């Protein structure tokens, strides 16, 4: 069973039944940070309301991986190095955590296409 870092994009794509994502969530395991949980909650809240957002938050909170102040520094340095990609704080942290933990970074975000350690689903 493979382990992945689930970018917010991938979770929202899976929840929207986008092609190609089901196997990564149903046959594998993955983690995400609290920053991703915040992005996902807000995206669901805007479209489906507070009840649906809360249900998704509850469902994915068990997959949360914490990060340290050293992770903050490293992720923001990485964000600076990749500034042409215009990564969000959450994206930079997630990509850093994936690399640190030896996980594939699962996303469909075009900014990550072709980067090392990324499992990109168009």
Where are these regions (language model features)?
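Histidine- and aromatic-rich ligand-binding microenvironments
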Residues: 6-7, 32-34, 87-88, 109-110
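Amphipathic alpha-helical segments within well-ordered protein domains
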Residues: 38-41, 57, 76-79
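Short, hinge-like loop/turn segments at secondary-structure boundaries
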Residues: 47-51, 82-83, 121-122
């Amino acid at each position: 069973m493979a382990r992945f870092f689930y970018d917010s994009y991938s979770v929202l794509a899976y929840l929207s039944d986008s092609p190609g994502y089901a196997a990564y969530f149903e046959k594998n395991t993955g983690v995400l940070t609290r920053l991703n949980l915040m992005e996902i909650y807000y995206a669901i809240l805007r479209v489906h309301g507070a009840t649906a957002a809360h249900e998704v938050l509850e469902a994915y909170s068990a997959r949360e991986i914490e990060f340290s102040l050293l992770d903050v520094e490293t992720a923001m340095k990485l964000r600076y190095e990749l500034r042409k990609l215009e990564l969000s704080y959450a994206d930079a942290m997630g990509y850093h955590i994936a690399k640190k933990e030896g996980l594939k970074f699962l996303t469909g975000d075009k900014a990550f296409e072709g980067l090392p350690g990324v499992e990109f689903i168009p």
